[in-house]
A protein has these predicted regions:
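Non-catalytic positions within long, well-ordered alpha-helices that form the structural scaffold/packing
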Residues: 23-24, 52, 79, 147-149
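Active-site-proximal cofactor/substrate-binding loop regions of enzyme domains
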Residues: 42, 56-61, 65-87, 95-126
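Radical SAM enzyme core and accessory elements
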Residues: 214-263
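Conserved alpha-helical substructure of the radical SAM core
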Residues: 1-63, 67-69, 73
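Active-site-proximal loop/turn and secondary-structure-junction residues that shape catalytic pockets
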Residues: 37-39, 65-67, 92-94, 130-132, ...
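A short acidic, helix-capping loop that chelates divalent metal ions and anchors anionic groups
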Residues: 2-5, 94-100, 166-169
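Flexible, glycine- and charge-enriched loops at secondary-structure boundaries
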Residues: 5-12, 100-107, 132
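Conserved C-terminal portion of the radical SAM core fold
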Residues: 26, 30-31, 60, 84-86, ...
Length: 263
């Protein structure tokens, strides 16, 4: 929906044309459903199912999790339609963080969304927006929460806050940079995850993101998965890359102890 209240949703017939265009120009691709808030569309399951019938094999939903938490059976409905994974807005582990960033207490709602997704066997990635002085002291707690909720939580995707668009906060003198984010991870996990564990992005400029993958060996022990040159989420071929993403973010009991941390 648009900010002026007018319904600006793309008709499902137009989405079908977009699917056909993608399939004709190199598909099948991995499909990411974003917004706004995609779950505001009642026909979201039909959109996913239609894409599946056309041959697309991976669907990712970016969501605040409100409908997933409040509507009984909704997660299972999306799973049945063909959804693989949910990238869940998850800014922290206390209500105060959500009251500051989202205007309301949401921690119990987030837990309920995760429970419903896990029961539907949907993979989950936690997606925190990190803001200085708001939740940068909860980086370690977010990672611990993710580890405690495996195998359904497949990873954590940190996004330092950007000061443009609808963001009402003024740019501080100490913004969250990639080097600072890495230091926070190492310090707040007490060295469980180290700065040197992480590598730059492969498809984009390596200074724009970082990632590391681990195997959980016990309650407080992780094994860093070795990164090979040219591998990771951006592999040597597009088919390999798409398959890597599907395997990494979809729920699978085979990969119970594998988790990825990215920014």
């Amino acid at each position: 929906a648009r900010e002026d209240g007018e319904n600006g949703d793309i008709p499902i017939s137009e989405i079908e044309k977009q699917y056909d265009f993608l399939m004709a120009h190199g598909g099948p691709f991995n499909i990411q459903l974003s917004g706004g808030e995609p779950t505001m569309r009642d026909d979201l399951p039909e959109i996913i199912h239609m894409g599946r019938k056309k041959g697309f094999t991976f669907f990712q939903l970016n969501t605040n999790g409100i409908r997933l938490a409040r509507e009984d059976g909704y997660a299972r409905k999306l799973k049945k339609a063909g959804l693989n994974t949910v990238f869940l807005q998850f800014d922290g582990v206390t209500d105060q963080v959500y009251e500051t960033l989202r205007g309301q207490a949401m921690m119990e709602l987030k837990k309920k969304a995760i429970l419903n997704c896990s029961e539907a066997e949907l993979g989950i990635a936690l997606v925190p927006v990190i803001a200085p002085g708001v939740n940068d002291m909860q980086v370690g707690d977010i990672l611990k929460f993710g580890l405690d909720h495996m195998p359904f939580v497949r990873g954590v995707h940190f996004q330092p806050i950007s000061y443009f668009g609808r963001c009402s906060q003024k740019r501080p003198t100490n913004p969250i940079t990639i080097p600072k984010m890495l230091r926070l991870i190492e310090e707040q996990t007490e060295g469980l995850m180290k700065i040197e564990d992480f590598a730059g992005g492969g498809a984009e400029n390596p200074y724009c993101s970082f990632h590391a993958s681990y195997l959980r060996k016990g309650e407080r022990e992780l094994k860093l998965l070795e990164k090979k040159s040219g591998k990771g989420c951006c592999c040597t071929t597009s088919d390999d890359s798409r398959q890597y993403v599907e395997n990494q973010w979809s729920y699978s009991t085979k990969n119970y102890d594998e988790v990825e941390m990215t920014q």
